[in-house]
UniProtKB/Swiss-Prot annotation:
Residues spanning the signal sequence: none
Pfam family of the protein (one): IGPD
EC top class named in words: lyase
E.C. no: 4.2.1.19
Name by which UniProt lists this protein: Imidazoleglycerol-phosphate dehydratase
GO molecular function: imidazoleglycerol-phosphate dehydratase activity
Species this chain originates from: Desulfotalea psychrophila (strain LSv54 / DSM 12343)
Intracellular or extracellular location(s): Cytoplasm
Annotated Gene Ontology cellular component terms: cytoplasm
Disulfide cross-links: none
Length: 199
């Protein structure tokens, strides 16, 4: 049996004319977090991702939020996806697949992950409210598009039921954390879970 070393960590920095982001991720953490994105709603959602996924996340971001939250949200998704990919390396010995149903009061979402090196996002979670606090609800999809592209994951997000936009998005972030934690669990075999021998 192959034992995956519990030291899957990464650190990514990204600076553009629009954002300046530093992120540290520990996939074998305990849900510890220190998050300051400048976007209060996104802080809340990423905290939930960290806690419910047992992932340690340190994140500081400065962006052009005087314009809107788009660049900051998308670029954090880019950096988080890169951090996941870096921490996992060749993805050898992990479960690779995971699916989670997660409720939040009346909201129920399904998150399915394949850490396949084939980036793809299916997103079907309509939120009626255009704003969640001051946060544009359409940015949730842009965030997960960036994460999936940079992490090299196939990611399906579906809302089964839901009325309250905050509940729907909260369930998505919690569910993503839980699904990711399951997909990276040790499988007990060497190499990638693929008939090709690699991903």
């Amino acid at each position: 049996m192959v034992v995956i070393e519990k030291n899957r960590k990464s650190a990514i920095s990204r600076k553009t004319t629009e954002t300046d982001i530093q992120l540290e991720l520990n996939l074998d953490g305990a849900g510890q977090h220190l998050i300051d994105t400048g976007v209060p709603f996104l802080n809340h959602m990423l905290t939930l991702f960290s806690v419910h996924g047992f992932l340690d996340l340190s994140l500081r971001a400065e962006g052009d939020i005087d314009i809107d939250d788009h660049h900051t949200t998308e670029d954090i998704g880019i950096v988080l996806g890169q951090a996941i990919a870096q921490a996992l390396g060749n993805k050898g010995g992990i479960s690779r697949y995971a699916s989670v149903y997660l409720p939040m009061d009346e909201a129920l979402v399904r998150i399915v992950i394949d850490l396949s090196n084939r980036p793809y996002l299916h997103y079907n979670a309509p939120v009626i409210e255009q704003k969640l606090g001051t946060f544009d609800s359409c940015l949730v999809k842009e965030f997960f598009r960036a994460v999936s592209q940079q992490a090299g994951m196939t990611l399906h997000i579906d809302m089964i039921h839901g009325e309250n936009g905050h509940h729907i998005v909260e369930a998505i972030f919690k569910g993503f954390g839980r699904a990711l934690s399951l997909a990276i669990e040790p499988l007990g075999t060497d190499g990638a879970l693929s008939s090709k021998g690699c991903l």
